[in-house]
Amino acid sequence: MKRCIIIGSGLGGLSCGVILARNGYQVTILEQGTQIGGCLQCFRRDGVKFETGMHFIGSAERGQTLHRLMHYLEMDNIPLSRLDKHGYDVISLSGECFRLANGRGPFIEQLSERFPHETDHIVTYYDLIEEIARASSLHSLRQADNNAAINTEYQIRSIDNVVDSIITDPILRNVLVGNLPLYAAEKGKTPFATHAFITDFYNQSAFRIPGGSDAIAHSLTDTLRRYGGDVMTRKKVTHILCDSEKATGVVTEDESHYAADLILASVHPSRLVEMLLDIPLIRPAYRARIHQLPNTTGGFAVYMKFKPGTMPYLNHNYYGYRDPSPWACEQYTDDDWPRGFLYMHMCPTVTDGSIPRFAECGELLSYMRFDEVERWKGTQVGHRGADYEAFKQAKAERLIDEANRQCPGLRAAIAAYWTSTPLTYLDYTGTEAGSMYGVAKDINKGAACHVQHKTKIPNLLLTGQNINSHGMLGVLVGTIVTCSELLTAETIYQQIKE
């Protein structure tokens, strides 16, 4: 039986672990933190529970792509609460709200009511989204349907380039990209294919996870252990050991040694390179390229506990923009931050499948560049000093003020709040510069910002959000890519069909 060490217990590490364990590998996952799950993990404050990264998922209705993957990974027990089908995302541009509905017909009809002169163009846009999603065998889970020409074209054209070529109304152009904080898109850089996959993912169906996203991590861990694998926390890998040809094991911070026939790294590529110091199998050019990778912007979050019975539950996500355009919010200045924000409620555990009447807690999320918190890098969580706490409070008050202006009554409903910065993400997940979604895609750099799942070390592979895309579907597609290297794609597709 081959011994497999997986570094990191995020969704990529856990899902790879389950697939390999059920196919005969002896899997051990090593997690640096005290809690499993990476961006799936949750935390409690003052009696309420908050999610940190995975707030809602798509395509989880029976027969849809994510539902099939969840079934394959034996996650049929995950509770789901459907977001409003008539408006799962609400985009607010300079005070005017637009709703995005699930399903082809409702999506087109709803936007056509506000933009009747654009109906044909909306149909063209939606058809293209579906065509791109279907053209990817990985995203459609139809192995024979891969269309390389379509995939390539929309990986090298930017979101704004394609949207502007289809849609003529400038307001509608902005509405269609209004949820871009979900992938930290940048104008002229982010490929349209990224937008298409994410739009298709949520347009099919959208759900929150009652009780929190850590249910996914716990379910995968239970399944892994049932197949004989294990997850160990407080095990930060500091070195990957190699002989002259291959990796042989890892060393953790507590100086434990773990021998391995195969190593999977579910970490940011920059962290992987740090584990491979003085390893001649890795060339200097590769190290330099990894360190030069562009990363998506970080985020500042305010986690709010509401006074009981004061905040009606929002069964949708709210994207609020001060200006008519959602673009360039990451290019804020000290004077105009925040240019935009994402506002969501957490779905509490529900026993009867009903939609809650009131929210217990919610989150505000806006962009924050790492340079704003870099002076505190190297300090420990909870011990960064009074200046850091004052900085966070000032930012939180500004973000709450802006959200309250767009959503009156929000501030009055807050009983208490807590915050996180890009530094929090760096310390808990190891993502470079606290980046929300890891490595950024940039059509102008082409393959230079694409991270291969394979390395020059034959038995060392990468998985997680950096090798394909982030989010539930993006990471699981990356998992299939990585595991196909070991089991063949045919084996995995056949198992998914079973």
Regions found by a protein language model. Give the residues of each.
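C-terminal segments that line or cap access tunnels to active or ligand-binding sites in enzymes
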Residues: 309-420
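A glycine-rich dinucleotide-binding beta-alpha-beta segment and adjacent secondary-structure elements
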Residues: 169-183, 187, 405-469
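Active-site-proximal substrate-binding core of FAD-dependent oxidoreductases
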Residues: 242, 488-498
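N-terminal glycine-rich phosphate/pyrophosphate-binding loop and immediately adjacent elements
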Residues: 2-128, 439
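Mid-domain catalytic core of redox enzymes
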Residues: 208, 238-357
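Helical element adjacent to the flavin cofactor pocket in flavoenzyme catalytic cores
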Residues: 196-248
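Rossmann-like flavin
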Residues: 94-190
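A conserved FAD-binding loop/helix module that cradles the flavin
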Residues: 54, 465-487
